[in-house]
Swiss-Prot record:
Compartmental location: Cytoplasm
Lineage: Bacteria, Pseudomonadati, Pseudomonadota, Gammaproteobacteria, Pseudomonadales
Matches recorded under CDD domains: SIS_PGI_1 (cd05015), SIS_PGI_2 (cd05016)
Reactions catalysed, as given in the entry: alpha-D-glucose 6-phosphate = beta-D-fructose 6-phosphate
NCBIfam families given in the database record: PRK00179.1 (NF001211)
EC numbers: 5.3.1.9
Keywords: Cytoplasm, Gluconeogenesis, Glycolysis, Isomerase
The UniProt record lists the keyword Cytoplasm: yes
InterPro entries linked: G6P_Isomerase, G6P_Isomerase_C, Phosphoglucose_isomerase_CS, SIS_dom_sf, SIS_PGI_1, SIS_PGI_2
Role description: Catalyzes the reversible isomerization of glucose-6-phosphate to fructose-6-phosphate.
GO MF, one example: monosaccharide binding
Name this protein carries in UniProt: Glucose-6-phosphate isomerase
Alphabetical list of Pfam families matching this protein: PGI (PF00342)
Length: 554
C-alpha cells in the first residue's frame, strides 16, 4: 500500500530511534570547534543545484548526523513518495486528488495521465492562451471601453491566488515590461480597495478575478466593489467584458458575473492554491514580466523538479533542508524557522513561504486520521535581513529558543549604489557567522578590558555581552535573482515541505482548518447585521458581537 494510505509511526523506525541517541551524543557539539578541527567542513556541507548555492555547514550536524537523517528518508519511503507525486497518484487522500503542480512546468511533448487522460496538451494550451492575452495587452490591442489601451492590471485574489504571484512579480521587478502596471487586491478591508482605486482610471484598468470556485468571500466582495467602481467611473455593463477576466474552474459563475467565456482561464483540482503560481493564477506574473520570462520561471522550477527526483538524498537540496528542519523540530525542540532574505525584491518571500509551509504542514493527524506522535510544521517568520538585524535578530542571538534560519542573498545587485551591496552581503554573512560563533565570557571580558573598564564593572557587564552561539543557519546564495533561479528557489521550498510531510505521515495538500473559520464567519456576520437573532455558540463571541452592534455606524 502507498504511504498515504498506510501512514507509518515514524517514531518507531530504527533511524528515528538512532537519531534520538545521536541527539544525546550531540549535546556538547560545538560548531566553532568543528570548523576549527576540519578545514573541509564547508566543502563537505555545501552544494550547488539549479543556479542556487547552499551552505549548510553552520548546522548542528556531523557526517553521521547527515547519514542518519538520510536513513530516515529512506525508511519512510521518500523515493516512492516522490515518484507517486510526479506520476499523478492520489496522494491528497482526504480530498481524493493527485498533486500535480509540477505538471505545469513540464516541457512540451511530455505525457502525464490523470484518470486516463493526458493532461499535458491542456496545460500547454492554457500557457499559449496566456501568451496570446499578454501579447495583446502589451501591444495595446486590448482596449477598454473608451478605446484606450490597458495601463493597469489588478489581480483580485487571496491566499495562493495572491501571495505567490505577488512574490514573483515583485521579486522580478527589474524584468518588468513597460506600459502595464500590476497591482494586487486581496484583503476584504475596504481601505485596501480605497487606496488602490484612488490611483486608477476605470477606462484603462483590467481586473483579473482569481478564484477556483468563484465563490471565495473576500475575492467576490472585492470583485463586486471593483465592478461598482467601474460602473460609477463611466463604464457600462455592455463593455464590462473589456475590463474583467477570470481564472476559475466555475465558468458558470464567472459568466453570470459578466465575464465572457473565452476570457475565463481554467484551474484544475490537482493544483492547490498555494502551489498555483505556475498556472493561469500566474497570469499577473506574465503580464508583469512578459511571457518569455514567465516561461523561464517555469523552466527554473522544472530544473529543480529534475534535481529533486534524481539527486541522491545526501546531495539533494530540498531533501537536505527538509531533513534539517525535522532534525531541529523533532530532536532539538525548535518551534519556528526564520526566513531572512537579504534582497529588497525578495521582501515578500517570507509571506509566501508562511502559507506554503504552515498551511501545508500545520496538521495534527496522519493520513488515516489518527493523531500524530511528533510535532509537525513550524511557525515560519522573518523578513528583509538588514531591517531584521535592528529588530528581532536579538532574539535569534541571545534568546532562550533555538530558531534555525535561512539566509537568502544574491551576489549581484540590480541597482548598485556605491558599496551598499558589499555591505549588504557582508551583513548577511556576519549574521550567520555571529549566530554560529557567539561570544564567550572570556571574549566579553577581554573586550571590556580593552576598553579600559575596571574589574568590578566588567564583572557586572560581561554576562550581558555573552552570546551563546551554536545557533544553526543555512545560507542560500544566488548569483543574481532571475526568473529561472527564482523558479528553482520557490520549487525547492515546495519540495522541502513535501518531504517533511512524508516523514511525518501527514497530508500537505489539504487545509481543513481554514474551512472552519469560513463556516463560522457566516453566522457571525448574520448576527452582526441582525439577520440572525440566536446567540453565538459562546459568550465571548456574542459579547464581541454586542460590542460591535452597540457602536458601529455605517
Amino acid at each position: 500500500m502507498a504511504y498515504y494510505r498506510t501512514p507509518h509511526d515514524v517514531t518507531a523506525l530504527p533511524a528515528w530511534q538512532a537519531l534520538q541517541k545521536h541527539r544525546d551524543a550531540m549535546q556538547s557539539f560545538s560548531m566553532r570547534e568543528a570548523f576549527a578541527a576540519d578545514a573541509k567542513r564547508f566543502d563537505q556541507f555545501s552544494l550547488s543545484a539549479c543556479g542556487l548555492f547552499l551552505d549548510y555547514s553552520k548546522n548542528l550536524i556531523t557526517e553521521q548526523s547527515r547519514d542518519l537523517l538520510v536513513s530516515l528518508a529512506n525508511e519512510v519511503g521518500l523515493q516512492d513518495a516522490i515518484k507517486s507525486m510526479f506520476s499523478g497518484e492520489i496522494i491528497n487522500a482526504s480530498e481524493g486528488r493527485p498533486v500535480l503542480h509540477t505538471a505545469l512546468r513540464r516541457p512540451v511533448g511530455d505525457k502525464l495521465s490523470v484518470n486516463g487522460v493526458n493532461v499535458m496538451p491542456e496545460v500547454h494550451k492554457v500557457l499559449n492562451q496566456i501568451t496570446e492575452l499578454v501579447g495583446r495587452i502589451h501591444d495595446g490591442l486590448w482596449r477598454g471601453y473608451s478605446e484606450k489601451p490597458i495601463t493597469d492590471v489588478v489581480n483580485i485574489g487571496i491566499g495562493g491566488s495572491f501571495l505567490g504571484p505577488e512574490l514573483v512579480s515583485e521579486a522580478l521587478l527589474p524584468y518588468a515590461q513597460r506600459g502595464v502596471r500590476c497591482h494586487y487586491l486581496a484583503n476584504i478591508d475596504g481601505s485596501e480597495f480605497h487606496e488602490l482605486s484612488a490611483n486608477l482610471r476605470a477606462e484603462t484598468t483590467l481586473f483579473i478575478v482569481s478564484s477556483k470556485s468563484f465563490n471565495t468571500l473576500e475575492t467576490l466582495k472585492n470583485a463586486m466593489a471593483a465592478r461598482t467602481w467601474y460602473l460609477a467611473q463611466g463604464g457600462s455593463e455592455a463593455e464590462l467584458y473589456r475590463h474583467f477576466i477570470a481564472v476559475s474552474s466555475n465558468k458558470a459563475a464567472a459568466v453570470a458575473f459578466g465575464i465572457r467565456e473565452e476570457n475565463i482561464f481554467p484551474m484544475w483540482d490537482w493544483v492547490g492554491g498555494r502551489y498555483s503560481l505556475w498556472s493561469a493564477i500566474g497570469l499577473p506574473i506574465a503580464l508583469a514580466i512578459g511571457t518569455a520570462n514567465f516561461k523561464e520561471l517555469l523552466s527554473g522550477a522544472y530544473t529543480m523538479d529534475q534535481h529533486f527526483q534524481t539527486a541522491p538524498f545526501d546531495k539533494n537540496m530540498p531533501v537536505l533542508l527538509a531533513l534539517l528542519g525535522v532534525w531541529y523540530g523533532n530532536f532539538w525542540d525548535a518551534n519556528s524557522h526564520a526566513i531572512l532574505p537579504y534582497d529588497h525584491y525578495l521582501r515578500n518571500i517570507t509571506k509566501h513561504l508562511q502559507q506554503l509551509d504552515m498551511e501545508s504542514n500545520g496538521k495534527s493527524v496522519l493520513q488515516d486520521g489518527t493523531p500524530v506522535k511528533t510535532d509537525t510544521g513550524p511557525v515560519i517568520w522573518g523578513g528583509v535581513g538588514c531591517n531584521g538585524q535592528h529588530a528581532y535578530h536579538q532574539l535569534l542571538h541571545q534568546g532562550t529558543q533555538l530558531i534555525p534560519a535561512d539566509f537568502i542573498v544574491p551576489v549581484v545587485s540590480f541597482n548598485p549604489v556605491a558599496d551598499h551591496h558589499q555591505w549588504l552581503y557582508a551583513n548577511c554573512l556576519s549574521q550567520s557567522q555571529a549566530l554560529m560563533l557567539g561570544k564567550t565570557r572570556e571574549e566579553a571580558e577581554a573586550e571590556l578590558r580593552a576598553k579600559g573598564l575596571n574589574e568590578a564593572d566588567i564583572e557586572k557587564l560581561a554576562p550581558h555581552k555573552v552570546i551563546p552561539g551554536n545557533r544553526p543557519s543555512n545560507t542560500l546564495v544566488v548569483e543574481r535573482i532571475s526568473p529561472r533561479r527564482l523558479g528553482a528557489l520557490v520549487a525547492m521550498y515546495e519540495h522541502k515541505v513535501f518531504v517533511q510531510s512524508v516523514i511525518w505521515g501527514i497530508n500537505a495538500f489539504d487545509q481543513w482548518g481554514v474551512e472552519l473559520g469560513k463556516e463560522l464567519g457566516k453566522g457571525v456576520y448574520q448576527r452582526l447585521v441582525g439577520s440572525l437573532e440566536d446567540s453565538a455558540e459562546d459568550g465571548s463571541t456574542q459579547g464581541l458581537i454586542n460590542y460591535f452592534r452597540g457602536r458601529h455606524r455605517g
